[in-house]
Every structure is written in C-alpha cells, then in structure tokens.
C-alpha cells in the first residue's frame, strides 16, 4: 500500500524536535546521581588522558563511522609519538587513549553510552561525530554533566537545535553553505530546467532544518519547491511522493535522508519512470559504499556536497602531510576508497591535541576554555569557534561518475564559495538514463 505524502508509517511515530532532544537528553538518566545535573567527579589519578568516542560502528550511519578505529589510531600514534602531551599541572607528558563505543546509530543508545563514558569511565574529553543523530544526544549529555566536547560532521543549524551550549563546540558546514553550493550547481543549468525542486526531508533534526532553510532560499532565487511534508525515518514506500513529483513536473530532486532510505526512494523513481534531470544530496550519497549499493548505474551523475576530499589544499597540524596523503594511507592500509568523514575524524584529534597542550591541565573548565580559544589550521581547513560555539569549514559541490580505479569516483564540479579547492571536472547534465 502506498503512503500519502507526510503520512506516518504504521508502528512508527513522527518525532518532534522537542521530543528528539528530550529523548536524547534523558537517555541513560537512570545512571545519574540525583535528579539535578552536576559536575562529574574528577578521574582517579591515572597516567594517561582518556577521550570518549561514541561512534556509529553499526546501524544506518555505520558508513560514516567506517574510518574508525583506523584513523583514530593513526592520529593517536602521531600525538603519542614522543610520549604524549605535556600537561603543565602534571609536570610531565601524558599519553592519550580513547574508548570507542558503538552507538548503533541510535540517539537513545548514543545518550546512554555517552553518559557511561562520563559517569563510569570518567573521560577527560569527549569527541563525537556523524550527523545530529549522534552529535545532539552526546552533546546533551556533555552539557548535563559539564564535560568538554568536540563535535564535527553534524550540520551546524541541526546541531544548534539542541543548544544553547556551554561545553560543546562544533566545526562543520552550515546549511546556508550547502544551500548555496546546491543552487550554484542548479543555476549553472537553470535554462535547461523548470527550476522545480522536490524535497525529501524527513522528520528528524536535519530534515526539519533543511526543509525550512532550503525552501526559503530557493524561493528567493526563483525556484518552485515541492515539499511532500515530513515523514518518518525508515520509510520505504515512495509511490505517493513520486506521483506528486510527476504531477508538479519536478526536474530537480534533493534529499537529506539516511543512505538506505534514499536508496529505496531512488530505485523506486527509476522503477516508476520518474528520472529528474538532477538529483543532489548530502547525507544519503556521501559514501562510495552508499552509491555503490544503489546498484547498476543508478549512481551515475548524482551530485553531492563535498566537505572534504583529496583535493582540499589543507595539511595536518600533527604531521604536516596533506589531505591526499591521508587518503592514500587509508587506501594502502585498508584497500578501500577514501571517504569524507576520514578527514574530519582526523581533524577532531588535531583540535583535541592542540586544546590539551594549551590547557596544560585536565581540569574540565580549563579544557573548555582552551576549546573556546581554538585558532588552528587543520587537514579540513582553519578552525576558529565563534560565540555560538561553531566554526564553519569549507564546502564545495561534487558529482559521482564512473571511475577508473573505483566503480564510482567523486569529482569536484562546483567551487564558487571556496575557489581555493580546485574543480576536477565539468558537471554532467542531465542525469544519464539507463
């Protein structure tokens, strides 16, 4: 049975932004001592620094967490090469260790494991990445228990829905950056389309934020937006959406779904004879594994935001090598294609090392103050936090094409906001039909 646009799937409920954050904040609350948030006791004296790492090793976001633990271990080896980080208050260098725990790509589980890292493991610092599904509940726990937290790979506005923040700091792109990158690609072929955009924006923090901000900006730029409404994550029947897009003559499609959900939608588009001239996404088609999983040639010509690549002209503050060298090292060690989260996971350790050196202490307030004062050039670009606790990192546009070394390779086709990141190919238009 097909689903009407915005209809709830039986057995699943549409979660509001308030419900999402409430669920994330109170996950694992039974572990709390008393009903009021309060600082966690200092860790027992130990001869190392401990960083907590909630990570989606499994579940729908597992492709985002795939570079771990390889990249974590590489960064730690560089940090600990000469004995670790000199902590002035300890009067000596301390090695850095991490505790990596699977969140199963679930916000409640993320809140639970984060609270355990704080209350049971007494981590000195938290690092969390990979969409607001991970970042928001982990940040909520760090705020609750006053633990400094470095966040990345979570679009800023979606992350800010869980604020205001005192202890958590995010470096990543903002939604206006991705909107402008997408519009730049669409404007380049605007004379060959009806400028009618269909949105696949689910009922989660990303979907709600993107629907609001994309719609406003696209209408300002003369685009018609066909929004079928919010729908539950996990939706697998898109017949009613496709019928609406056909009726409204949608020729550009955009999505911010988890990869398995978009894969279902995109396959059904082809099965039901709806092939837009362009399809541009973020989260669902970031990963090589996600586009390959579409099957056949369904990835050919898909356009996507690119927040990190071998072509980004930035270097590691830990070891001095560039983005391409990190990608090459990953491929040589694992035999797998580079992915965008690889650089951002690495960069969180660049920030952590810099912060701990400047703090000279494991006092959590001093670590928090050091995060706030960060001004560092990293492998993903410069990071300097503003008063809202975030730092913007560069964003360009890319396109998946048939590759020489890999089944699908990502080319840079748009760089209007960041011309220092060079284009590697021209935009293929329209999407090739099978």
Where are these regions (language model features)?
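Short beta-strand elements in bilobed, periplasmic/extracellular small-molecule ligand-binding domains
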Residues: 85-103, 167, 219-232
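N-terminal secretory signal peptides
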Residues: 1-19, 23
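Signal peptide-proximal N-terminal region
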Residues: 71-98, 192
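Extracytoplasmic ligand/sensor domains, especially the bilobed periplasmic-binding protein
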Residues: 70, 108, 123-228, 277-304
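Extracytoplasmic "Venus flytrap"
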Residues: 52-73, 101-107, 130-131, 200-209, ...
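C-terminal segment of N-terminal export signals and the immediately downstream linker at the start
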Residues: 14, 35-55
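Solvent-exposed, acidic/polar segments of extracytosolic/periplasmic ligand-binding ectodomains
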Residues: 300, 372-434
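Extracellular/periplasmic periplasmic-binding protein-like sensory domains
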Residues: 165, 269-346, 410-433
């Amino acid at each position: 049975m097909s689903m009407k646009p915005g209809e709830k799937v039986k057995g699943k409920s549409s979660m509001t932004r308030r419900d999402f954050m409430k669920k994330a904040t109170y996950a694992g609350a039974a572990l709390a001592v008393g009903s009021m948030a309060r600082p966690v006791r200092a860790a027992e004296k130990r001869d190392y620094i401990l960083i907590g790492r909630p990570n989606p090793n499994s579940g729908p976001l597992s492709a985002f967490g795939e570079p771990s633990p390889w990249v974590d271990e590489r960064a730690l080896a560089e940090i600990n090469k000469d004995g670790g980080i000199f902590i002035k208050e300890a009067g000596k260098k301390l090695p850095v260790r991490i505790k990596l725990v699977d969140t199963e790509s679930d916000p409640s589980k993320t809140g639970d494991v984060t609270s355990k890292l704080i209350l049971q493991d007494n981590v000195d610092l938290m690092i969390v990445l990979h969409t607001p599904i991970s970042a928001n509940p982990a940040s909520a726990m760090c705020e609750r228990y006053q633990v400094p937290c470095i966040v990345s790979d979570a679009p800023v506005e979606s992350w800010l829905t869980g604020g205001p923040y005192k202890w958590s700091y995010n470096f990543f792109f903002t939604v206006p950056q991705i909107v402008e990158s997408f519009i730049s690609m669409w404007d380049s072929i605007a004379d060959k389309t009806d400028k009618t955009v269909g949105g696949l924006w689910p009922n989660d923090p990303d979907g709600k934020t993107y629907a609001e901000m994309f719609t406003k900006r696209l209408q300002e730029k003369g685009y018609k937006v066909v929004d079928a409404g919010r729908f539950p994550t996990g939706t697998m029947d898109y017949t009613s959406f496709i019928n609406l897009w056909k009726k409204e003559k949608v020729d550009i499609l955009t999505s911010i779904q988890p990869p398995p959900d978009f894969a279902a939608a995109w396959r059904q588009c082809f099965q039901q004879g709806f092939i837009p001239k362009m399809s541009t996404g973020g989260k669902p088609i970031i990963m090589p594994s996600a586009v390959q999983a579409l099957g056949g040639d369904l990835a050919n010509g898909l356009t996507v935001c690119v927040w990190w690549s071998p072509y980004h002209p930035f270097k590691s503050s830990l070891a001095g090598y560039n983005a391409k060298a990190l990608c090459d090292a990953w491929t040589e060690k694992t035999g797998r294609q580079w992915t965008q989260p690889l650089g951002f996971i690495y960069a969180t350790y660049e920030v952590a090392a810099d912060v701990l050196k400047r703090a000279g202490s494991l006092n959590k307030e001093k670590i928090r103050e050091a995060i706030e004062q960060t001004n560092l050039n990293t492998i993903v670009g410069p990071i300097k936090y503003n008063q809202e606790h975030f730092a913007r990192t560069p964003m360009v546009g890319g396109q998946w094409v048939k590759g020489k070394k890999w089944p699908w390779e990502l080319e840079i086709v748009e760089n209007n906001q960041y011309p220092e990141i060079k284009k590697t190919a021209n935009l293929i238009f329209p999407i090739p039909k099978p």
